[in-house]
Each structure stands twice: as C-alpha cells, then as structure tokens.
C-alpha cells in the first residue's frame, strides 16, 4: 500500500494564471479569479444571507478541487467579516472540507498567491502548515475557520466521510477543472454522495452549466437552477436539496454519535496528555471544561517523564493504524507550534528521530516502511554512515530517519499547558479520584472517594489504565503496561548525540541544561507496580549497549538509580481508542447475531452507546504523537462537526472494534 500522492505539474500563462499540465486547464479565471469565486460560489450559495439566519454553531462547506486555495481564502475572509459584524450570533465556526488530487508545490502556491495580497496572512499560514504528500485528511486551523484538506482522488476520499457525515454539509463549491478536461471527476457517484451528505435546504454552486452535470445533479435529487455565468460564460448552475432520501448506514455498529448539550459543560477524568489535548480542542469550541485528576498534581503517571520522543508508529501491519499515526504526527506538530506561540514553556528540540536496524527483525520492519512511498521528510532509509552523521555518534547499522521527529518534556508540557488553560477558564480539581459514574436524565453524576458528587452534561474518560475501573467500561479489552525510564548523567561523548535514537529502547539527546538524558523503557504487561526496579535499570543500559555495540555506549551509566515508573494503557492491536463509550450489554444483545443479520440483509440497529459518555484510551507509548489528533477528533464528535480522520481510521479507533470483529465472524464475545 502507498500513502502518498503526486504534486501537480503546472506552469503560469502570460496572465500569470496557474495552468495544470495534467488537465490542460486554468486554476481560475483569466479575467478575475477572485471575482469569479465571489459570484459563482459565495453568491451562488447565498452564504451571507444564510449565515444571518443560521441557528447552529457551525456551518460546513465542502469543495471539489482545492487548487490554489483561492475559494477557501475568499470564504474565510467573508466569514471573518461576518463574525466581526455579528459577534453575538449563534454561528461561531466555519468548517471547510476540500479535496485535491494533485497538491501544488509550496513554490507554486507562493507564486499563485502573489496576485491576491489581501490574503497575505492566510497564505502565510497555509504555506507554514502545507501538508506533506500524504493521502487523506489534513486539518489546519485558521482561527474560527477549520480547513480539512483531503489529498487524493475525490472518488476515493469523499466516501470516507462515511455514515457520520450524512446530511451534515450546508453548501458545496462544485469546482475543479472543466468536465471536458476532467470527466473522471464529474460523475453520478459524486452527485449522489453530494446529495447524501447535504443537509435539507443545503445548496451547491458550480461554474459549469454542462448538460450532463445538470442532469446528474437533478437525478441525484437536487433542484437545479441556471444562473447567468461569470464573465464570458453564458450560464452556471446552483441548486438546493429540498427533500431527503433515506440512506442505509453501511456500518451502523461504528456510528459516532454527538453529545446532546445545552450548557457545553464537560468533565474530563484524567490529568495527562490525553486530557490536555481534549481540553484544548474543547475550549476552542466554547466548552466549559472541568478536569478531575486523582493525583495531587497533573501529569504524574504515563505523561510524567522528563523527556519523551515525538514520532509516528510506522511499523504496524495494520495500514489504518499507520495512516492514523501519519496524520497524528502532522497534527501534533501543529499543536506544539500553537503551544510555543502561546508562550507555554516546555523543553523540546526538533532534532529528528533515528530508527536503528539493530537486528534482522527490525531491518525487515524498516524495509517494509521504506516501501510505503512516504515523503523524505516523514521517513527515509539511510546507510550506517549517513545515519551516524544525523545522530552525531557512530553506528554500525543502517536505519530509518524521521526528519520531523523531536523530543519534548511531557510533564512540563502538560503541567504548563494546563496552567495556560486555567487562565482560559478550565477548572482543575486534583486529588479527586472519581470512583463511580451514574447516568442522569441530562448528563452524568460523578462520585469521588469521599462521597462528594458532581454533575456534568458530558464526561470524557482519559485516565489511562484506570479507565476500566468503572462499570460502564469494565468490559473494554484494555490492559496496563509498566514502564521504567532511566535518567542518566551526560558525558563528553553523549553530548554529541544530536537526535533521538531508537532501537529496542530509546535514548534522548541531553536535556536543555545539558546535564542528563532519558533512556528506556522497560515493558511489563498487566503490571501496575510503581516501585523502582534495579534490574530494569540495568536492562535499560544493557539493551542500548547490546543493540548498538559501539564504544560510546559504555558512557551510559544507570548506577545513580534515577528513574521513573509509569503505567501505560494499551490494547492488543496497539491502536488507540477514541469516541463514544459503547454499552456492552446492549450491543451484545443487538449484535450477537450480526453475522447472520448481514447475511440475510436484515435491519441492523445503530450502535448502542452511553449517551454523553466518551473516552480517549490505549495511547501506549505514543501518547505524545497521538493525543492531539485524538483530542481534536473527540471534540469534533462531541460537537457533531466534520472529523479530521477518515471513516476507515475512525472504525479502527472505535472502542467496540474488538467485539464487532468477533460478531461479524459469528463468534461469541465473553
């Protein structure tokens, strides 16, 4: 499987307009691209007028053909003007979903944007976070506007919006190259999916008036109207969805279900990286967030190490898990940049991560990764000599190099970021061990060890391996993993280490004081003992010396017995969990015969979940990388907004996935 896409091949004509070499067509009008956007798409969908009467907190636009981003810039600017003029309006956020088969190179984007200096700030932000050439959804935040940029063929990506997005899109920009130039895109499958995902009274607008396009949209169910065309074009089309068509859910057992809220009152149980990232995404949407942490301070468990590596898990045999981590890695870097911009202080270094082929098994894994066709800034195989140069110390093996990898101080990051969130209104309650959850008519009651009770509309469980302590979650197939990370003094040799070094363990570069490194970590499943282990301390040292087998490794000295033990939460398939908490007993009753229900094509119930109860779990050893995108995904689900991941990834992260796989095979779930 490949995860990458190709760049667009373009040139600029005499009018300085970009022209596609693949499709032999201009990206926007030779006359006035911005005026065309305004007339065809903004006016064609009557956006300003509809925003005035809109009663929901978010408005969703989808677009075929991102191109230079001109349409996105124009609608983002218009929405900013709307928000400035209507500060107290219920409409707060704009979601813009766009599909692009051949993304432009950064240099081409820059040149194309020179014609529109009024979008200079938007252009700079887009260029800063312009994604690597990875298939799928890339979420980029522009204040109150969120861009979901899907790289790849729209015929493959649009279905990946999935059942969740049925009737959630308010307006369509049906753009792209002309039907005569790109006939593969303009087809009935596209029109039918557009209709399926469009809300009742949702609209579309397009620059073309081609007869086949009009008939296809009408056949899908839209009421189509001809308008005067822009410039020299005689006509263009717009349309309205008046009546719904019932659409059978393809995977009802995985359907994500938003919260039912009036006050946006959310409790998060847990005090680590998962809780933090969920809180960040929630407060951006206006939620009132309360954190319940059982420890006396935040980030004392799995998120409490002094140094941790930030890089994607690419060696999984499950392509959907790899796909998730590729996008989580990109989104996580965006969150770290946001934290730096907010002056949240935490030690970090964007130094790259080296993955050593220290034995035959690891060499095979890295070779498989190299065959995924990933961009070089994500992964590339290097010789021992090349890798040694990157690392700063001699190695005797080849390996993988992740240029954008980093290390950061997890505890410092979590604690200081939470301090920042407190100033934004987040309430933090430490020394609050929640022992029971009781469902109310509207929300949940939380009970602590002292018998005190708290009520909230929505509850998120993000308390690591203790997530199964509740009656509602005790059936989830999660387990704890003990890990001891050693802190070692630096030396003249170790100070030369320039990147994170991974083998059957990991070693970080020196901290910012240049006094110590972290090396780890032991792994013991179903072990929650937090006591220091001298044996594990020695094993952390021995693994490095055995795997790397270079003289400089003898400088590693764990005899000070400085170490930290944390308990991670994991699951057998090693993918995280995010979303609704499934109601096991009800799902067991609904799906025990799922194999036969599907075979007989009988009606199947949507997943029975606990209303307004959600989770982020099983982050394992990659929480720094996965938590930001998991938190953003969960906030999107809670608010009923478009998701930053594909339907396939969502299914792979669903908490009931292990049960469903058995039910689909006709097997029992105990």
UniProtKB/Swiss-Prot annotation:
GO terms for biological process: methylation; tRNA wobble uridine modification. Residues 1-242 are annotated as: tRNA (mnm(5)s(2)U34)-methyltransferase. It catalyses: 5-aminomethyl-2-thiouridine(34) in tRNA + S-adenosyl-L-methionine = 5-methylaminomethyl-2-thiouridine(34) in tRNA + S-adenosyl-L-homocysteine + H(+). The keyword Flavoprotein applies. GO terms for cellular component: cytoplasm. GO terms for molecular function: flavin adenine dinucleotide binding; oxidoreductase activity, acting on the CH-NH group of donors; tRNA (5-methylaminomethyl-2-thiouridylate)(34)-methyltransferase activity. Keywords: Cytoplasm, FAD, Flavoprotein, Methyltransferase, Multifunctional enzyme, Oxidoreductase, S-adenosyl-L-methionine, Transferase, tRNA processing. Its cofactor is FAD. Residues 269-670 are annotated as: FAD-dependent cmnm(5)s(2)U34 oxidoreductase. Disulfide bonds: none annotated. Its EC number is 2.1.1.61, 1.5.-.-. Its main location: cytoplasm. It is found in: Cytoplasm. It comes from the Bacteria. Catalyzes the last two steps in the biosynthesis of 5-methylaminomethyl-2-thiouridine (mnm(5)s(2)U) at the wobble position (U34) in tRNA. Catalyzes the FAD-dependent demodification of cmnm(5)s(2)U34 to nm(5)s(2)U34, followed by the transfer of a methyl group from S-adenosyl-L-methionine to nm(5)s(2)U34, to form mnm(5)s(2)U34. HAMAP family: MnmC (MF_01102). NCBIfam families: MnmC_Cterm, PRK01747.1-2, PRK01747.1-5, tRNA_MNMC2. In the N-terminal section; belongs to the methyltransferase superfamily. tRNA (mnm(5)s(2)U34)-methyltransferase family. This is tRNA 5-methylaminomethyl-2-thiouridine biosynthesis bifunctional protein MnmC. It comes from Haemophilus influenzae (strain ATCC 51907 / DSM 11121 / KW20 / Rd). The gene is mnmC.
